[in-house]
Amino acid sequence: MDDFRKQIDSIDQNIIENLSRRTEIVLKIGEIKKQDKNAVYHPAREIEIFNRIEEINKNSKFPSPVLIQIYREIISACRALEKRLCIGYFGPQATHTHQAAIHQFGSSCDFIAFRTVADVFKEVELGKVNYGVVPVENSTEGAVNHTLDMFITSSLHIYAEQYMPIHQYLLSVCPDLSSIKRIYSHPQALAQCRLWIENNLPHAELSETSSTSEAVKVCLWDKYSSAVAGRIASELHPEIKILAENIEDNPSNNTRFLVIARKDCAIRSANDKTSLLFAVKDQAGALSRVLNIFSQNNINLNKIESRPSRKKAWEYLFYVDVDGHRSDPHLREVFQAVEKETVFMKILGSYPKARITVEEIS
């Protein structure tokens, strides 16, 4: 056994030495970025690294999701040596958006919670934070209209995206499930766990709070209460215990989050997406003509969502996600054709498609 432990010690030393060498190279790249005035955060490059690491590790016994988490923190720590980023997110603290922000950027950043989606947009626009993280749609409840509406007037761009499964946990300072008398949470979270609560705590009193984070704060002083919240809440409050995991009624429920920035993500990846807003003329077949342009040019539409324009009654804007990067010559021609058929068109950004790997974040 001692011999095996010595081998492990030697391997650990090699890992640390290689991490140190990797860091030195990252800092050299950082100097080049600074000279060229390039951003330190490149989501396309990070996705490329994660995909390569996963491929290298495919025949290993070490779990790839854990390896990706480790590399996310390595990248975050190295990025912070170039420049420590400040990330604004739709709060409060310990919510799913907070968790999404950490998952996107790693923990070597400063995170600031804002009360509303509009506040996140405002602080990014003013340059008080480098990037913002906001929810844009949920697989069971549809679009987050507040976020879509902000893009109508905002000058910000979509820089990256992320999908995160929404898992709910029952948290409490009381270690005994049978002693729980009250359950606190946001009404949406309570609704997502209705069947589990009915089957496991049918006599518990349900109390609504302004957020899952607020629910956790309440149950810190209410001994025989519990909170429905995400795992991150238990990590931020060590005195809180997890009584039950994954208590949501729909295990496939997930939310899409956007990273917003003052500049577009100019660097292309091998698998990009472009988002745009447009309004069509008030005449029969106007929307159909626009959609036919995409169809005839073999451009796949990932999403289409309508929103009131707020300028004129019964006038609508359409939010669309399509495959490809805005710099693609073919897609540029398609957008030019679309613009001729619309009264308003705005490209919100081109960015790499998110890695859909639920195991990393569940």
PLM segments and residue spans:
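Domain-level signature for soluble enzymes in the chorismate/prephenate branch of the shikimate pathway
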Residues: 1-362
